[in-house]
Amino acid sequence: MQRSSPQPDFSSPFTVGWDIGGAHLKIAVLDQNGKLIVVEQYPCALWKGLDQLTPLLKHLFNKWTPIAQHAVTMSGEMVDLFTDRIAGVQALLHTFAPLAGEVPVQVFCANHGFLSLNALEGHEAEIASANWLASAAWAAQQFEHGILLDIGSTTTDVLCFDSSSPIPIAIGDADRLISEELVYTGVTRTPLMALAQRITWRGATRGVMAELFATTADVYRVLGILPEDADQHDAADGGKKTRAASIARMARMIGLDGHEYDDAAWVDLAEVWQALQQAQIQAALHRVQQRLLTAPPAFDNDSSAYPLHSVFPSKQASASAPPSKKSRPIPLVIAGVGRFLARGLMHHGSAPTDFITVEFGVLGNLIHPDNQNPVLADYASRCAPAVAVAALLFRAQ
């Protein structure tokens, strides 16, 4: 998928942000003035091998030239292609670096900000799956305090920022799963069996088959709210991505066939699955909200805070600033292809009433006034980490 300005200027070098995931490769391109001109997302089944990534990188390096600098973040190091996450980080960077040639490559390294390729040894653990922190750092430059909610195809990130700096409870994936800042649920790739072992539908509580028969993409396709081009991987059965095929897959999860009930019944079932997923996200959002309301300021050297305001200066941040007052409503910066679930939480009263939602893609005036393309802003929100690392690197210069 690609969303770009009508006439990108290929005579001046670009800043390119990369988010190398386990299932998708996302890219954001800024022009010489730091304005966003393109956001692209490609399916990349990294668990199948690095040969899924290398040709794609070569294509994009040739497509977007000249390039002034690369900003790289990732989460793909966790796929089971690699023996461990450290090996994954090393393999991905060893794949990327030769293709970049002489163009500078800066890698996002958590609280260290950006590090060049020759300074990365020993920092692999901080590079691993730090893409969410880049998104939060960019959001924190726009608001003194708030919450980032990024609902993606596979996972959901929920974390707060205060005093213009992210203040995560945890950093690594294992700890983030405990803190609920990482919720392993998304709107296309999550197997329905991961949402519940039993569900209540049509007056009966019934078991759910522990089989990869259907995913959340089927639920939102049945409900008619799955964004265009959101589902870039094969369906659970390798079949068609039609509404009828999704109904059949969803029915199979509870031992039924799609022809056994009418359309309204299947919509009801899809809404059951949606409610279960929203409840998971809502619980995490509530917990992180309480963290924000009770958190000390990030500059107080709280052991769980990452003082990124010192790495990426912001007009709001100051090492001597007083603790921020949590004004209401709280900015809720929404990102990811599943932003429609966040809006659903707001509209259906299942979320606290003291939030105001802000689309990630409009932050920082990255889109030129002459290019106010809502589709570009949409894709900037979908691919938040790629946009964030590009913007952070450009503005740090």
Predicted regions and their residues:
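Nucleotide/phosphate-binding catalytic cleft detector across ATP-hydrolyzing
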Residues: 1-22, 28-149, 159-315, 323-397
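Conserved Rossmann-like nucleotide-cofactor binding loop
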Residues: 23, 154
